[in-house]
Amino acid sequence: MNQKDTRKETLEFNKLQKRLRRNVGNAITDYNMIEEGDVVMACISGGKDSFAMLDILLNLQKAAPIKFEVVAVNLDQKQPGFPEHILPEYFETLNIPYYIVDKDTYSVVKEKVPEGKTTCGLCSRLRRGTLYSFAEKIGATKLALGHHMDDIVETMFLNMFHGSRLKAMPPKLRSDDGRNVVIRPLTYCREKDLIKYAEHKDFPIIPCNLCGSQENLQRQAIKAMLIDWDKKTPGRVEAIFKSIQNVSPSQLADRELFDFVNLPLDRDGSREEYEFSEAVVSSTNIDESLFIDVTNI
């Protein structure tokens, strides 16, 4: 690569980095994800998204107007072939506090899920429960997950097509028991940007299919659909995401969100005070010159 190409590549990466940092900063501000004194537990799986999230959070931490801590946590689920040395070595180079949590959820999943079925759903639930418990143990006030805009839109369509529910992933969520708050700092970030960012940063990425399970085929189909839309109509994924931010319950059909039963008219006077006028036009007095001869069309 010549000097001109190197300069161009550096310029493009700088633009990408600024865009991602700006998107993360805006998401944090819009949803009040991180507050003064927070201990943010960054959940690192070893994939491109969580690596990028950690990298961006650490950079924003240096310039943020508030003080907060970032603690990296990886859950070692004892999958066969998982390179246990990679993440500790990486965290050491960053000189940040970190924990490796050993929890053999792999054996549980293999025992519960029939052969040939995807294990991702149960694996995810077990992982979430373990991380919730560990967050309390270390005093973390926020759990940061690496889901991005594409994940959120994909999840919405998954729930629509296969669950008949208009539901996605919220940027910020309080757990059902009220004991943890989950944040998704990459909410405004596109996956294609994160792929480029990870490639340039050369993160030590660990594949997520060490367990032998394949990604849910339904999600694969939706991901392919969004990629196709993105090629044919750039900006469509962003537009769909914005629609999630601009919901009009009265224009949908959920009776729990909007009271369609009690819709009184805002009019003065009683119904008896109104009079009906005669119809202006009836079927017997229409001007026949207005008709169009369509026999030869």
UniProtKB/Swiss-Prot annotation:
Enzyme Commission code(s) on record: 2.8.1.-
The UniProt record lists the keyword Zinc: no
Co-factor binding details: Binds 1 [4Fe-4S] cluster per subunit. The cluster is chelated by three Cys residues, the fourth Fe has a free coordination site that may bind a sulfur atom transferred from the persulfide of IscS.
Pathway(s) this gene product operates in, as recorded in its UniProt entry: tRNA modification
Recorded GO CC terms: cytoplasm
The UniProt record lists the keyword ATP-binding: yes
Keywords, ordered alphabetically: 4Fe-4S, ATP-binding, Cytoplasm, Iron, Iron-sulfur, Magnesium, Metal-binding, Nucleotide-binding, RNA-binding, Transferase, tRNA processing, tRNA-binding
Miscellaneous comment as given in the Swiss-Prot or TrEMBL entry: The thiolation reaction likely consists of two steps: a first activation step by ATP to form an adenylated intermediate of the target base of tRNA, and a second nucleophilic substitution step of the sulfur (S) atom supplied by the hydrosulfide attached to the Fe-S cluster.
Protein name: tRNA-cytidine(32) 2-sulfurtransferase
Motif stretch (PP-loop motif): 45-50
A GO molecular-function descriptor: 4 iron, 4 sulfur cluster binding
